Amino acid sequence: MKFGLRYCNTGPYADPLKAVALAQAGEAAGFDSLWTAEHTVMPESYASAYPYSADGKLAGGMTDMPLPDPLIWMAYVAAATSRIKLATGILILPQHNPVLVAKQVATLDHLSGGRVLLGIGVGWLKEEFDILGASFADRGKRTDEYVAIMRELWSADRPSFQGEYFRFDGAYCRPQPVNKRVPIIVGGHTRAAAERAGRLGDGFFPARGAPAELIAIVRQAAAKAGRPADAVEITTSMPEDPADLDRLSNLGVDRVLVPVTGLGGLKTALAGPEDAARWRDTIARHATA
């Protein structure tokens, strides 16, 4: 089992010195990855239901919390580290132009030596889509097409694509990623997200917990798509009780993420960069689990 750090670009880690300190401490302690969050803009009020709380609202202080652009934050700490992977967890893909995202992600992967993991989601905050001028109603369908576009640009010698939203023939987007692909981790808590992960993802990230039923849906969707049952890596949040790590391993979880703040009510959090070292023994103990 692998361990990553979550919410790395939030709150205090918007500060450049603290960002580097966190990234370097995580790498030194044996964490395999740094995971960032994204909201380009947060409306002061909204009717959309936040899916990860009982009352459908974000926790207090999250609306105006500093939240740097995840890809730029990752590029910044990439220059101060050498091994730790750099992940979005998640990037709200249908809010973006997929050709531009493909370029940005490939550039970051190229410059960091192949360390990027692209976690994607369809988003939940309609008001944010409205501010950005992005389509909310068809965001799932757009996500599927955008993934196909990025993979074409990353891997093809002569990229061409004919889709519902984008079409191009012989469009070069260089440099390509180090391995001509970047692992795509599908985030979400719904059946649709789990099926998308099984059908086309390299990973699945149910944001809270590791529901066995969602993991089963991922495996079923992978099999239906003609993919191996273990083709999709499972990442989830660190349980509040470390004794649950064995249970998660038995469910097929490959990676757990330790929050670096108490964002969203999560209680298992680092006290600061200096706190990363205390995880060394836990990481070593579960390295082959």
Predicted feature residues:
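Active-site-adjacent structural elements that line small-molecule/cofactor binding pockets in enzymes
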Residues: 1-289
